[in-house]
Amino acid sequence: QAEKAELQSVDLINRLLLKPQIGVDFQSVIRSLDSRQIRVELEPHALEWNVPLETLNDDRYFFDQERLYLSGRRQGRLIRIGQRLKLKVIRVDVLQRNIDFDFEGWLN
């Protein structure tokens, strides 16, 4: 119970911090990934957030569970933990607990 409340508080603080940052680009690092989303850390704030794979609009990515990476269907790009990308904050909904990003490009 207490751990869940703490996580909800951290998420609320993250949303409040990003609300005035709409339209701002952030360099980000992938901290984890799965078949539906990547978890990124936004620099320099060290805020972590889940980003749906559909946000990565440069290709259609599939998760390789054995090798723990995403593979692009058209371009063959491999996405791994630690990879850097640029994301733009486009919407923050504090009440709905949601932050939406636009994918701006890969940094490495």
Report residues per predicted region.
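Structured C-terminal cores of nucleic-acid metabolism proteins
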Residues: 1-108
